[in-house]
A protein has these predicted regions:
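N-terminal "pre-motor" subdomain/linker immediately upstream of P-loop NTPase catalytic cores
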Residues: 1-100
Length: 100
């Protein structure tokens, strides 16, 4: 997946429901949003009915970009925090966690 495809999926997630507070990208789950305190699956094109570990990792690495410091922190600590922007649409606070 390329950044352009990630941005397209994030846009679909944002447009899927009203009052979205969180976007969730979790192994073994579909893409989900939190709306009014409820987790709701998001139908996207292409569909992601159940994210694989590989798909989730690719998604996270695209959000991290080429930031070596964040990548090293993720590897050494199992998590990293960053911000990500969809120009003209939204800015996100991102928390990436890895399972060992």
């Amino acid at each position: 997946m390329r950044k352009q495809e990630i941005d397209y999926l994030l846009t679909q997630m944002l447009d899927s429901h009203d009052n979205i507070s969180d976007l969730n990208i979790t192994v073994g789950k579909p893409l989900q949003v939190e709306s009014a305190g409820r987790l709701l699956p998001v139908e996207t094109s292409p569909a992601f009915p159940q994210l694989t570990p590989f798909q989730t990792e690719v998604f996270a690495l695209n959000l991290i970009g080429h930031d070596r410091r964040l990548t090293e922190h993720l590897v050494s600590h199992g998590s990293c925090d960053l911000s990500y922007e969809l120009p003209g649409k939204a800015r996100f606070r991102v928390n990436v966690f890895s399972q060992r």
